[in-house]
Amino acid sequence: EIASCLVGSEMCIRDRCYTVIENKRKMCMIYKSILLILGYLYGTMLTATFVVKHSTGNDVSKIGSGNPGMANVMEHIGKKEGVLVLAGDILKVIVAGILGRLLFPDKTWHDIFLYTGFGAIFGHNYPLWRKGKGGKGVTVTCTWLILTFGVLGAICCIIGGMVVLLTGWLPLGAVVIPALAIPTVYFIHGKSIELVCVLIATVLMLIRHRKGIYRIIHGEEPLHLKLKR
């Protein structure tokens, strides 16, 4: 009887532990999903559409390349408008993270920005309200890298900016930025969700700039900053 009681108690403890672990996993998935959705919703707020509409009365899709991003607005509307787009795209990533922290104050800023920022990239690139026709995600991705990985993210962005200044090719610098983060994130975090997110961000950047990369390969890409000698 004592042995049976001990076995029963052990099974009961195991069941309780299993239940606790499963509940924690479910809660973890829920909070991550909420942060991703929150980031996505803020990401869909394309600053360029509001700035261009206010400045010209036109839809951003009818301006230049039609891309709702800083480079297109700055080139075809003006520097002031381009800076406003830049500021707005940075701000929406920050605000999404702050709201995420208010919802989950027990989580670290790293975890909060990892998911809200990652969601913002998808929202910016593929907003449902524009049938998936969003921006190319350079500013949003840079902001996400800096807020999530700190100095590492900033260094990647600086090097990417230098690539643009030296070559004049914005698509090349854009792809270099997240690609540079891959080996360092792997070294620091190993095979982690951080590495998966950076890999996906790099693939997204390649997809969004594939036409520009193609033109670079075939010598057809114009010099965006005209600094190439």
Where are these regions (language model features)?
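Interfacial segments of multi-pass membrane proteins
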Residues: 74-78, 100-104, 123, 137-167, ...
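Cytosolic, membrane-interface loops and tails of multi-pass inner-membrane proteins
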Residues: 50-82, 134, 214-229
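Loop-to-transmembrane alpha-helix initiation sites
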Residues: 154, 170-178, 189-201
